[in-house]
Amino acid sequence: MSERTQEQDFVIITVDDSDDNNDCSIEMVEVSETADNSTNDIADDSTYVTADNPTDDTATQPNFPGGNDGHHRPLQMSYGSGSVTQAGVQWHDHSSLQPQPLGLKQFFHLSLPSSWDDRRTPPCPVAHGDQIVSQINHPVHLRRYSYNSEEVDFPKRGRFYTPEVQSSISPPAERQETHAWASPAVTSLESAACHELQEADLSESLSYPRIVSSSSLQQYVAQGGSFPCFGMPWNFISGGAESTNAVISFANATTAVPMAVLSRRESSLANNPGVVNYSALPENENVGPGRALSSFCFHPNLEMPERPANSSKNSTETANYPTLMGNYNGQNTASLSVFIPPYFAEKIILTEMPGTTETNVENNSQTVYYPALSGNTSAPYPASSYLPITSNFESGPQMSYGTMSYSTEMKNNCDQDDASASACLTPDFALLPLNILVKVDTNTENSVNTMNRSTLLDSDSGQDSSSSSVCIPPKYGYLGDPKRNVRVLKIHLLAVQNMAKPKQAACYLVRILFSKEILISSSVDIHLKDSQSLDPNKMAALREYLATTFPTCDLHEHGKDWQDCISGINSMIYCLCSEGKSTPKTVRKNKKRTNRVASASADRNDQRGRDGGEGCSWMFQPMNNSKMREKRNLQPNSNAIPEGMREPSTDNPEEPGEAWSYFGRPWRNIRMPCSVLTLAKTKSCASLSARYLIQKLFTKDVLVQSNVYGNLKHGLCALDPNKISALREFLQENYPICDLSENGRDWKSCVTSINSGIRSLRHDVRRAEARSQSLPAVTPPELEQESKPGDPDATDPST
């Protein structure tokens, strides 16, 4: 072999066998510059180097495992510029694609199975253009290594493969001692220690040749990968008779999810891979039964303690997660894999994990199984998609983590066995605030360490889960010292706390504690400045509560602020007395009227059933309701009080022949005549319509004593909020361009217009009362004509 000053390339061909009587022949082929020129000639001649027929120039195919007609032959791939095909195996020279530094030798490592040679292969010439390269015999396991070499497997034909990471290469000395090619870095076919084991497991030990290219370790990412958002190496090669795993370079391994890998004493890549599979995310993915999994095998940066190797096919460490979304049909189906970053997987695992959980464990495996997150999964054992748990995952022989069991929260879940499930979490997780139960589940039958996560749904009837009770505050609260046993609704106490002055709060609470009749009677019997006529226990409780609510005010028994509160209470009582005495004066002077005017009441509970009679005074001329509708004489300041002003009754309508409809939302149970609603819709603006409808909703006696929102300082109560809300909804429906929300500008204008109309009505009533006091009592002309001196029924008020 001639020495060269330039860059030299070598090809190492190794024949492996467990027979001690045979020797190994390793052919080192020097790739010179003339090899590049003769690449096309070599490809056309298809020169092969065989172990069975060393002197034959024709192509001979070895007996591959499962070499029947249905078995796929190794895939012929052409990534480089030059290629040499040997015994059905094609190796490639990628040196033309990537720049190589000077002085760096490139080695091409071709590893052949034991069935290709009998250890004592006679020297065979290797045709490389016009050169004949001599053969060099080496020991069976002696290999030439490069610092950046790597072993790969051939894929099956027609498969799509995703990359898999292998770690660093173990030294040759260790391979000579152990007689095995399995290590955490390079996983190849295991050579049996004895001849009997090899004969027994001949079908398992055979595999395709493996090829190593030093230039395959260059950093490169393809532009047209199957997954555009994830980097894929340009020179990934997959292999193995039963495996569909691929290899990626260490340069791209930093973007992958680190997971646990095989220990040094575990056997082969095909039978014992420490891989993590990730299935596809898209929707409506239908895959047939028996389809192989395509998975990523990422470069591990985490350690896993050693464990005795088992050659069974089920000895895997797999993180198993089912499909995320979509409709997947078919039994035992699998989908393509997608690289998912750790932060994406953690977010899905922590916050979006509905569904039921099961544990899929077979013969010494560490399995994490998560069911489908969404979509319809109709198969009994649907395809599983695989997501990483965490970037700092470690696996030991006995699972020494603290296992956290999330209680299963499902609808109508009475199964005690499914009430809780354990999940192994590392400190990197950001846990949501959940009620958890600590429970360790151990299964020593197959030495299985299971990690299972429960679902979080609405209701939970399981016995192992903890339920949170809703604390409903009590309806009533004590006023002052609880020993006084003075209770009011808490809503009133909250309203008092929002008031600015204790005087307003005192008037509000007095109106709540005492009825109107008690306040009026107390103020009539004694002097108005003396409030001791009221219940002293309630008044003391009122003062104590005000002192607690307004600590900066002087609310002692003789304090300044408390005296102001008493003055405000007396002013309110005086207003109530004056308003109550105003209407009965006219009634006493007109005892012959059929219906007397009821006493004014601002109490909200007394509004229903309170209406003025027809012609409550001689000034109010009775008018038929039908005549008023014909004349449309429904002005707010009219002296006549028609029957239409009475509150509508849903049980007994005023006119059975009149069409009625709901006012506002139907659940408010407020009905109004359709003619009234039609007239209200014809108003030019919302404020005029509200001013018209307020007289149809309430009687005149209620309006003169009330206000829209009330004013306790002046003795005015708020109108029925249910009817006010119905009015606002009606206006909002018929005037959509107006801002008629609770705090809307147009609704405030409507409230101002309603209050203005009520003030006008109140002023007219007072002016009528003043005129009636100045004039003598006059009997109406109708009664004078009917009454005669000798008629005994003349003085009967019933006539």
UniProtKB/Swiss-Prot annotation:
Disulfide bonds: none annotated. Residues 34-63 have a biased composition (Polar residues). Residues 32-73, 584-616, 629-656, 768-799 are annotated as: Disordered. GO terms for molecular function: DNA binding. It is found in: Nucleus. PROSITE patterns: BEN. Keywords: Nucleus, Repeat. Residues 586-595 have a biased composition (Basic residues). Residues 483-582, 667-765 form the BEN domain. Transmembrane segments: none annotated. It holds the Pfam family BEN. GO terms for cellular component: nucleus. Residues 603-613 have a biased composition (Basic and acidic residues). This is BEN domain-containing protein 2. It comes from Homo sapiens. The lineage of its organism: Eukaryota, Metazoa, Chordata, Craniata, Vertebrata.
